[in-house]
């Protein structure tokens, strides 16, 4: 070789040496890349490869969503969701609900509803159909809505003059079921009549619309459309600027007063406020006009007294006429959803499919008020075929046990603090998947008239009885697309009736995918209960403050709830994988079981192109604080998903 090199010209010799160096660099880079890829996707031995229909469908979903060009240690959300967001308008979350609603609609439409003698399921089906008929244009009840508003003393868009605020508030709640600002439950006992005031059942719809209009700046069009449909003649009307300014101001006053329900106590300022025309004699007169017999004294209590007090402040600071106009504006917005197809589209202001999905949710929740289980009874009978219920319950117990172990080992653990009432029972968790008689309503509900084709008339029936607060909270959670509801009084959580839906859960999927989807919801619910129970402990507040990452306190709370139980989720999956080796999914063999847990966890949070709000890497915010994630993907110290400083968790 030395002889050969001596015979080569110097320039050529340098060129060969340079080429050798370049080749060495290329080979080294390739080896490093392969090593990194191997670290990301280190295979674990699987007992078998799942090729069931559920597995193949899920594999197709993930493979079309995962963007392999993205380093999961740099941006895990984009790694998992890049493909989905490019190809879909709706989020995975919304897409799942759309699928659930399609199945529910077919089920409810197949139920035979007799004109009389209806049972709970038949009445719920009739309410749902009458609601959907408005959206589909087969019924128009604008005339009935306007008549009902007239009966309540609401003349919007005309400004209110010398209006009876108390009568309108009580009438829309007790006769129409269109309570927005305030709802009232009448409790009669030996001492007289007790009115329990609470946040209106339709308040959420006004708040959500206000938030969307603030983001889209389409308020003037929305206002004008309502004004033209509800205007009675050519008399003067309120302006868009007047209503926008008052609504913005009022919601700022009341929004910080919507705390969790407390034990009911008296609100004397509502019963006796002469400057607002409120006296016990006035309450008696209005109640008697609304067919409520008042033999003795009247009292007003509330489980949300701060909210009620804030409503009174808005009333007092602006006078009865202005406040009545605001009450009217809120009521008209809610009543429009009962009127006709055009007004429904004006409210949602989006494409037909999205409107159909969200109004379908509205209709389902209206039916749930009459029977929280009936709309989902047949749906869940299909979902829970085979061993699905047993698998879901065992998963829930496994995650609860792992969470309790972590909690017990926490430095600040306090045996006197109850996070979960009974760790070994899931009766409350799966309450909505069991048949129950009575469902906790009042006796009046057993004597309800039969439902008809009129949605307006059907919804008036809701004012004849009062459901427990947790039922109303469940309805609100369904409309918010939540998978569970926290029952603080019972120190537990309750799954929504659709929580065991694909792709969140399917008993035919490997444990990794079910723990990443359904299991993460169980962990999140337990995280919420933990933070609530330890809210007076500074260390739990430090978790929330750390998870804010410069955002709002509410954002920090949400991120902390989602994150605090993820270590327990990993423990739960590991315990299952050790007992019986997990299966992999055909087409996803390169991912380990734990990697699939994190992928499935993130996938259900993938946003679509139409998603509102900041495009933050929602999965990264939580998973960067979970050391098991960095270990599973071999993330180098200092990578975005393996930071030097993590938030303190359990």
Question: What is the predicted function of each stretch?
Answer:
Residues 53-55, 71-74, 79-142:
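Active-site-surrounding "flap" and adjacent substrate/cofactor-binding loops of secreted or lumenal enzymes
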Residues 97, 101, 240-243, 252, ...:
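Intrinsically disordered, low-complexity linker/terminal regions across diverse proteins
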Residues 108-404, 434:
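Noncatalytic, helix-rich "gating/capping" subdomain that lines the substrate-entry/channel surface
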Residues 1-26:
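Helix-loop boundary elements of multi-pass alpha-helical membrane proteins
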Residues 65-86, 213-230, 566:
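Hydrophobic/aromatic-rich, well-ordered segments within soluble, folded domains that form packed cores
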Residues 27-38, 528:
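Membrane-embedded alpha-helices of multi-pass membrane proteins, especially ion channels
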Residues 79, 200, 496-498:
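Active-site-proximal beta-strand/loop segments in catalytic clefts of secreted hydrolases
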Residues 35-54:
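Ser/Thr/Pro/Gly-rich low-complexity linker/stalk segments immediately outside membranes or between
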